[in-house]
A protein has these predicted regions:
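Short aromatic-glycine-(Arg/Gly/Cys) micro-motifs in beta-strand/loop hairpins
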Residues: 1-18
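Generic hydrophobic/packing signal
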Residues: 2-5, 27, 109
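Conserved NAD+-utilizing ADP-ribose enzyme module
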Residues: 7, 19-20, 35-36, 40-152
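A short, exposed loop/beta-hairpin motif centered on an aromatic-Gly-Thr core
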Residues: 20-26
Length: 152
């Protein structure tokens, strides 16, 4: 997780809504992706901190959703979350991130310039980055463990 501060105890109160998978604490298993996100802070002259966590493999009483590709289900879910529409919620959601390249396609779809089919056709050739969104404070407290932080 990249932020402008060290975060040892994440809480959902500080999470923004209307993101790819809704309001939650976002992480990635891809260090290079987290460091690249930190560059956004640095370009604005803001300190960037890479916060490293471990997430228990065994998680009881959690709902978990994985999107393995940028498909119709992913597109519909992201659209509902980004527009703040009602949608099925999960404690943990994992799937592709709407980075700059993907966001352009998604934005064209949201604005009505692309049809759903055109957007999906564009997205099918894109290899998903990985993001994990934890939407449950219970899961954050019980299964996510702060390991260390590093200033980028």
């Amino acid at each position: 997780h990249t932020s402008n501060i060290e975060i040892q105890n994440p809480d959902l109160l500080h999470s923004r809504s209307k993101l790819d998978f809704g309001k939650g604490f976002y992480l990635t298993p891809l260090r290079i992706q987290a460091e690249k996100y930190g560059e956004r802070f640095l370009r604005r002259g803001i300190k960037a901190m890479l916060n490293i966590f471990s997430l228990d493999d065994e998680r009881e009483n959690c709902t978990y959703k994985v999107f393995n590709s940028y498909d119709g289900e992913w597109l519909d879910f992201v659209m509902a979350c980004r527009k703040g529409l009602p949608h099925v919620t999960f404690d943990i959601i994992e799937g592709g991130i709407a980075d700059d390249q993907v966001f352009n396609t998604v934005d064209l779809y949201f604005s009505g310039i692309y049809t759903r089919e055109q957007a999906l056709n564009q997205l099918q050739y894109t290899k998903p980055n990985r993001q994990i969104c934890i939407t449950s404070q219970y899961v954050l407290d019980k299964y996510l463990h702060f390991q260390s932080s590093k200033q980028l």
